[in-house]
């Protein structure tokens, strides 16, 4: 006779606890009718005879039939295609549960002792889950610092759904979205941006309507918001930055809240040493070992303001050297530069071989950044990405969404080293500006999202790209940016290809399906994942992810099903 689930105070009885339970893990045997209704990821309660109520999550389900065990009496019959009689077989199901804690009036307490064999197991109610969500689920009114990105795995149906939430109060601690191509990682980041774009205010950031954001868009995954800013109405404007000469340059916006701007860099935001390091690094493909003399000499040359004023008198603005002008004059006034270097040669300040290498590095920089891609205007005042631009996009009263369009349409024919240079310069400018905000006591916030993060902070031990001029400043932002309100959101398909120091600074991870070679790295960088989660990392369906870290409202890793974005017409949901 079938055992039907009992209802106790509105709860459905699912089964009974088996022996050898621990304070962190246990097994229960479901009732016959409950065998088909339970799912992995399902929340349950254990009402112990000790007077305690445990909250737990089903992590694994196993079905048993004595006639289908290896070497059983029916083994020979099975070989002949004869099935044993189901009605006389000993059949049962066992469900493994992870014990999350003990439900108390004050919330969820740590379980300091295990439940007892025979304790009944019930389906968890919304009231049981309130300590985890920290608000009344029955009202649907969540705090404004939570954004809903999907559903808890196992609770996706309309009649039985639980929201998957992200806590924005910890966004300044950085986060990463990882997964192989086609796993849904760009859809997930897009969903987060969409949710930020519909906020009407954030309680803990009273002056902000939403969090300003800048996205390094590698494949055009976020251009929907430029085409239709109504998808992200909380942003006063959606700005698309593209390279001069790209296909996007001639595609004017159709919406009044969209703006198209060509990428123009202001070198004056950086020190002579930083400029010199960039020029030499690009020339040597990032391998500065052995180029120390060149770097030191170029740094000294660019720092000698008096000599530069004398030779490049048109490059002086308000008594200051305009390095945009100096670099632009390299080709036209090469003789002046050669005269400076010749003076140093005669004074034995530089070896001829070093001087020649520095000249070649300067010419290479000019040809790549100015002649070919036109991203350094003749004067710094004509730069589009400058301190005023940062002030504008992070204005709390009118936060903006900025898309650095590095797709084939926005960066047609642009070398990776040039994209790295742009990202490095933007990050350096942001770091400098946000440090100044903090010194002045001014609170500013910006989410900086980088798609294909492995190209900008590569792990040089394993990733063939070899180097990135953006890596050093990206590491600085990862380690210190949180203090100033500069938040990172990294997106990558190969997390082990990203610099380990940068990845270790991420305090929240949204993990989609990963490559087998990345499983160990992911488990390490996240601080360890439960074995039952780790086993599934390589074969999760698209849209399914593991959420873990400080932006997770749950104090442990959980499976979540991310909702699809409202619109995504430029590329696949990857």
Write out the residue ranges for each language-model feature:
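P-loop NTPase motor domains
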Residues: 205-208, 220-231, 246-473, 547-550
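Short loop/turn elements that form and flank the Walker-type P-loop nucleotide-binding site
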Residues: 171-172, 208-210, 396-398, 441-444, ...
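Phosphate-binding and hydrolysis-coupling loops of NTP-dependent motor/remodeling domains
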Residues: 2-4, 43, 95-107, 532-574
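Conserved ATP-driven motor cores of ASCE-family P-loop NTPases powering translocation/secretion/packaging/pilus
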Residues: 86, 470-561
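Glycine-rich phosphate-binding loop of nucleotide-binding enzymes
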Residues: 148-250, 500, 521, 547, ...
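Conserved nucleotide-binding/hydrolysis micro-motifs of P-loop NTPases
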Residues: 62-64, 101-104, 172, 219-223, ...
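Basic- and hydrophobic-enriched, low-structure N-terminal and domain-boundary segments
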Residues: 1-180, 187-195, 199-207, 441-444, ...
